[in-house]
Curated annotation (Swiss-Prot):
Lineage: Bacteria, Bacillati, Bacillota, Bacilli, Bacillales
Gene: mtnN
Single GO term (MF): methylthioadenosine nucleosidase activity
Any one GO cellular component localisation term in the record: cytosol
EC numbers for this chain: 3.2.2.9
Reactions mediated catalytically: S-adenosyl-L-homocysteine + H2O = S-(5-deoxy-D-ribos-5-yl)-L-homocysteine + adenine; S-methyl-5'-thioadenosine + H2O = 5-(methylsulfanyl)-D-ribose + adenine; 5'-deoxyadenosine + H2O = 5-deoxy-D-ribose + adenine
Source species of the chain: Geobacillus sp. (strain WCH70)
Binding site for substrate: G78, M153, M174, E175
Protein name: 5'-methylthioadenosine/S-adenosylhomocysteine nucleosidase
PANTHER family: 5'-METHYLTHIOADENOSINE/S-ADENOSYLHOMOCYSTEINE NUCLEOSIDASE, 5'-METHYLTHIOADENOSINE_S-ADENOSYLHOMOCYSTEINE NUCLEOSIDASE
Keyword Hydrolase found: yes
Keywords: Amino-acid biosynthesis, Hydrolase, Methionine biosynthesis
Amino acid sequence: MKIAIIGAMEEEVTILRDKIEEREETVIANCEFSTGRLNGADVILLKSGIGKVNAAMSTAILLERFRPDYVINTGSAGGFLSTLNVGDVVISNEVVHHDVDVTAFGYEYGQVPGMPARYKADETLVKIAEQNAKQIKDIQVVTGLIATGDSFMNDPARVEFVRSKFPELCAAEMEAAAIAQVCTQFAVPFVIIRALSDIAGKESNVSFEQFLDTAAKHSADLVLSIVSSLQK
């Protein structure tokens, strides 16, 4: 069994990379792949780069070249639920694009033509994530909808627009739906794990810079426990 872990930025992958044993590095199309053993499992860690195009391209390379059995996306996000705080963690049950609009042709808002309106995370991976989340102290962990777009959510008007389209939205970020779409095309199970570095629209650029490392650690800690559970 091989487990792939994807993070967009150095801050989101460095904790995991440092723990990989027998590590080998490969660069393909400027995407950084690290293979080896993590908590007893065979893993491929990918630093994808930021944004949907980078995420889709690198995920396609990952799935075609390395053939993982599972994909876990880790990293930071902006929170949308009023009950969530910086550092809290969101586990995806579904993922959607928040910047796709082909409603003029009868599609749902966020739906890419020919694709499902939302991408469903693997139920087994979600359950494993939820079980391991029970061991986490001092932060909230919720399961829900994550939305993706090629913009950082610091514009209050944009935040309110996205919230109006997806009232149940838990978090927004810049890669997950692209990763989910590619995994769906390849029929590879996935789950998204995101810790909040900011609350969307509330001085989010300042919060992001201040709390990115904390968010990355919280997300990585849960990913490590998921990897261990999958290996059992």
